[in-house]
């Protein structure tokens, strides 16, 4: 192994830590169905409207899966690059449904934060299986928390911007579709 550091999302990371992050990401990808089920349950617990019917629940679950797989796959590559900057289409699908149904956008924030918390808790459990307590585990958790939280912040920003655009289009269409009253 060469003695240099990777730049992951602007963070200098030693190769040994990049490898450990990849090992934990691999474990989580191997258990992705369980992770997504936990994320889904946590989101519905805090925002029951996201499980109100099969259609929105399926979209929410697809979004959770797409975001988790995207981030974990990027970490598992062990190449020092973060997750892609674009938002998974599944994440945009569910936010459009939220807007079209007139659901408060705060649900999106709650859902992402709850999903992030579940993923982070699972990551810590797997990390403790891969690395003994000590400085290496601390470095692994510090790097991963920065990468994970930055990814979620970035996705939330883009998803909310898309939601606001969608809402403006819907409101504009409704406003233009209403006949004007004469004075």
Locations of regions flagged by a protein language model:
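Hydrophobic, helix-rich cores of sensory/ligand-binding and other regulatory modules
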Residues: 2-183
